Amino acid sequence: MENKHIRIKEYLLNLLESGQLKGGDRLPGARRLTKESGVSYTHIQTVIETLVQNGIFETVPRSGTFVQQGWQSRILPATFACNILPWIDKLDEIIRKDLPQIHVCRKFTKGIFEFRVTHYLFSHHDEYLDLMPLFKECFPDEENYFLKLLNPFIVDGKLCGIPWIFSPRILLYNRRLFREAGCPIPHDNWSWDDFLTTVDLLKRKIAPGQIIDWQQSLHYWINLVVRSGGSLFEPAAEDPVKIDSSETIRGLRLYAELRERLFPDGSAGLPQDVFENEFAAGRAAMAFAPRQYLYKLKLHPSAQELELAGVSIPTPEGGRRASMLAADLFCIRKNCTDMRLGRECAKLLFSEAVQDYFGKTGYGIPFRRSSAQKALKLDDELDVKFLTEIPQMVYDYNIFSPELYALVTDGVGALCLLPSEKIAEEAHRLADAIRIFLRIKRSRKLQTA
């Protein structure tokens, strides 16, 4: 009985996620559903009724059953959301084999079980369970994991996520394009001025949009903020807002100056997906990247022809050697009603076999030490570069609410598009607005205490 219910649930959800059924569409008739799924209509009707209760479908008397608008935002039991990741088909295969009751989502934006990136998890931590009890129960061999990586994700005394894979960020570059431009190969101790000289040399041969991946997103500009010695917040400080500190402003100004140097006409870079394709095809020169990026590159038809190398992100004068942590973290939402399944899911994802497999694909560095040792090759120049950057990793986003996350990502992203000489003034305005927001939030918290 249960297997039939799982089969029809998968069938119906796949109709939605493949686009065969859209919001407002009427479900096919009983005869077609029975024929295509191979399950009796009695079982189909039971699953449909459950999905009606879950807000996926709605039944209209004398008209039939229809797909709800906005079904993608519903959170279904026994679902795993990681829809933006490039290896989702392989993960689906692994989970389906051992835990067939879990549906791996392609289009649902949230699941009971999820992989989330670092800055998103910090800002939405209160939506997730404390996983420390699960970690201690499921992984008694805890010395076989990079335990220090758990510390950043303990917020208000609770472990909101377990790093599944992680990586420092470096600067990837294409040796062939450097050679053709007559540009010296960069070295790990290069300065910001060295980097700008490199940009100018590359501009002789390469279109500005193909020199480096310049984007407004947090995980781009944050690299120069931390390399300049800046940060976003310091929760323990009397004034925790550091967006308008001199170091942070310097990093943002440098990032804006890079845009101005590349695009003096006021335009911006290529869309992220377009640049990634250009880089994979060997037509773009440099990219800020964690090891996860290598997996995407390998999927491109021209991957074997790339002459890839890696170097530390340049350090501005007076800055610090720092590399922002990039991680995919396993999380469980608070509305999980089946922790047994959660434990089984965690055991599978952090098993030696699964960690070994994804480590060897080049997708990040596994959280399991033995898998990381197998994945990182000492005779591979890029792997050695990622290894040497691990001690430099920092993770001090310290953005602990969705509202604050939106203020920072949208606000600072907009700053980066301003003329560089206006960055300081507008950073102070943004920081003051955030201070007001934090005071209001603190006041409300005291009133409800």
Question: What do the predicted segments below correspond to?
Answer:
Residues 196-241:
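Extracytoplasmic/periplasmic solute-binding protein
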Residues 381-444:
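C-terminal capping/gating helix-and-loop segments adjacent to ligand/active sites or protein-protein/ligand interfaces
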Residues 328, 332-400:
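Mature extracytoplasmic/periplasmic domains
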Residues 56, 258-336:
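Extracytoplasmic/periplasmic substrate-binding proteins
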Residues 1-27, 31-36:
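Extreme N-terminal segment that seeds HTH/winged-HTH DNA-binding domains in transcriptional regulators
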Residues 120-170:
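Hinge/lid segment of periplasmic solute-binding proteins
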Residues 238-269:
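Glycine-centered hinge/linker elements that transmit conformational signals in sensory
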Residues 49-92:
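HTH-adjacent hinge/linker in prokaryotic transcriptional regulators
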